[in-house]
Amino acid sequence: MDRIEIPVLVVGGGLTGLAAAVFLRQQGVDCLLVERHRSTTFLTRASGINARTMELLRNAGLEETVIDRSLHLIEGKRWRELGQPADRIPWVVLRARDLADIERAVIVEEPSLDVADVSPTRAQWCGQDKLEPILRDEAVRRGADIRFHTRLDSFAQDADGVDAVIVDRGTGARTAVRSRYLIAADGVRSTVRQALGVTGTGHGSLGKAMSVLFQADFEPVLHGRRFVITYMANPQAPGVLQTFDENRWIFGFFCDAYGGGDAAFDTGRCADIVRTSLGIPDIPLDVQLVQPWEMSHHVADSYRSGRVFLAGDAAHVHPPAGAFGANGGIQDAHNLAWKLASVLHGRASDALLDTYHQERHPVGTEIAEQAWTRHTYRLDGDDELGRRLVDTKVVAAGYRYTSSAVLGAAYPTAIPHELALTGLPGQRVPHVWLDHDGRRVSTVDLAVDGFVLLARADGTPWADAAARLAATTGIPLTAHVVGKTLTDPADALAAATGLGEAGALLLRPDGFVAWRSDTSADDPEAVLDGVLARILART
């Protein structure tokens, strides 16, 4: 049996696993990814990519590629406009009796696309079937070992690493893999999570469901109107219609509404269900794929078990309402990747990896509850549930961390009710446009491959200390002084953060503020050295 030694083994080649491979290679970490299916997915239950996830993809050099392959979201209020181009889609969620009477549809949710004050990029509508190949190709380009049609057969961990056996499903060839760490991104039914015996909490199963991918010309009914999702409030035939791409759609329904989970749902029956629910019984449909799945709400009680980490659906699963699932998985992967890199490159102790659970578990728990609340509210419109909803922009960009990897942060919740990005530790750095060598750059773009010390005009001693520490410790740490290496004519950074003239922010590789000082210090190098030691768990 062949044997491979690799720093990180990633199990699962969906969005989370492929993103992990990209981010690990971006941080200079070798990895092997195994995925039991032959290729990336042909169907999508994830299309909405929020602005925060786009920031991560932007920093990996993928923003333009994703935009080129996306439907372009426009303001939801424009959904009634006739004759819209097929590649434009209003970001709106509707509830309608049937599609034939779409003019009477009620707006259930209309997320704002106006994020220019929050992010250097914006949300996109890019199906999982398009995004997975983008991530796969980028991971391969960066040097990741990606193996589809390969399954994890077994694994066992010890104090120093993980021993696994993988099997090529085509040839039956078995390979022993020794890794320092394992990322389980193997989905809702994660075999790794089950083998570890990790328990979870949540509302449990919400029912067996079917997704029907089909092609149809709805122009005679819609007259160019477009929307992201419409909940069909047809008492005899309820379901959800989602735009897939320019000429294809996905219709989802709970099996219990049509005879139970054991009933046969072939393409012919599914086509009839779609026609009935949409109220247009004679329209031609080309059903291309029917996929059963189970909607559930479950969050793992622990995201870490020794040298194994749960990410994406393996860690948290919830209804698709809000498009939080794939976004959360990609953000899990990014949070974990820079921490693994810090440990594997000898810059941090293994204890830094405990902050993955400390940070991502509260976020995953609260996002799962938001998704469940949105799902229930969209179905019945209960006002009490509506009052519990947090704006999508806040959920996407406003989550914050309380952990030992941020100093001075103690938040009662991971997701605030109102957006607050003010440069405090535990928050993503507020987006401010600055000028660097004649080029406009966002503060969000500064910390890509390492830490960044961002000082105001009188904070040069902080920047000088950072430069010395980078040289002596090997920690990737770049220093910028506003007014010297960066210019800020509008003084926007001070307005956004309230940072003092002699103050500085320390940004982590994920763009979150790890520490701040509003004043100078007698020995800035000693202070900053101690700060980094605490963040990287070296003390």
Curated annotation (Swiss-Prot):
InterPro entries: FAD-bd, FAD/NAD-bd_sf, RIFMO-like
Positions bound to FAD: 15, 35, 128, 152, 313
Function: Involved in the biosynthesis of elloramycin, an antitumor polyketide. In vitro, catalyzes the triple hydroxylation of tetracenomycin A2 (TCM A2) to give tetracenomycin C (TCM C). Uses NADPH as an electron donor and requires molecular O(2).
Pfam families: FAD_binding_3 (PF01494), Rng_hyd_C (PF21274)
Residues of the active site: 231 (proton acceptor)
Organismal lineage: Bacteria, Bacillati, Actinomycetota, Actinomycetes, Kitasatosporales
Organism of provenance: Streptomyces olivaceus
E.C. numbers: 1.14.13.200
Signal sequence extent: none
Gene3D superfamilies named in the record: 3.40.30.120, D-Amino Acid Oxidase, subunit A, domain 2 (3.30.9.10), FAD/NAD(P)-binding domain (3.50.50.60)
Single GO BP term: antibiotic biosynthetic process
UniProt protein name: Tetracenomycin B2 monooxygenase-dioxygenase
